Amino acid sequence: MKGVSDERINAPVRGPDEIFEASRLTGDATREDLESIRRRTSVYVYEAPVRVWHWVNALAITILVVTGYFIASPLPSMQIGEATDQFVMGYIRFAHFAAGVVMSVAFFGRIYWAFVGNRHAWQMFYIPIFNKRYWKEFVFELRWYFFLEEEPKKYIGHNPLAHAAMFTFITLGITFMMITGWALYAEGAGQGGVTDSLFGWVLGYVQNSQRLHTLHHLGMWAIVIFAIIHIYAAVREDVMSRQSMVSTMISGHRTFKDDRIE
């Protein structure tokens, strides 16, 4: 989409206090930007690789959570005959490992796109901790989610609260789960392999296998809680803030459903 899309995504940085956050809140845009958004109602934000990664990652996490739960709490055997003939847990473990590989490869692809994509592509990989404006907007969003503000602010990318959540639970969370997950895989694969060479140090650092399993399991529950809140917040904002959320991750366009943009 031409016009406001290109202007917003390719606009030069105007100052350290204005665009530390890639989200570029519309309430702080220029008068011309606001009028363009009013006329066109839509801004192209998320490129195709970002959207594909989002849904691939969501599917991989779903498989990892379900299979990971059963690995930690195996099903009681209800089969008749030898367990080796049924191989139920073997299939569950294989699905877990396969989904872990997919998530890992996709995450490295996402890191690559952060460098070559538009400025929204790298938003989740950092937090502008020294930007006072960011934290002011962060507090506002907290108040909005707790129903202490009457009107929402609208953002082109992630709002500051979502920005912090994505960095914490996706960027750091996935990194943590990959490191601990591959370390557990390396333990089972044995010494001398590639995974042991890359991740064998983790077990030594944690000091025992059970602690490593526990940390990985707790990380799973943290991501589950984040996913539930993430889905709730996306649907809530779609309805209450009058700007698209769910459809944006399908089409790539952020649609503003009314002209209340400040």
From Swiss-Prot:
Tagged with keyword Nucleotidyltransferase: no
Residue ranges crossing the lipid bilayer per the database entry: 52-72, 97-117, 164-185, 218-235
Molecular function GO terms recorded: electron transfer activity; heme binding; iron ion binding
BP terms from Gene Ontology: respiratory electron transport chain
Topology term for the membrane: Multi-pass membrane protein
Domain of life: Bacteria
UniProt keyword list: Cell membrane, Electron transport, Heme, Iron, Membrane, Metal-binding, Transmembrane, Transmembrane helix, Transport
Function: Probable b-type cytochrome.
Family of the protein in this entry: Belongs to the HupC/HyaC/HydC family.
Protein name: Probable Ni/Fe-hydrogenase B-type cytochrome subunit
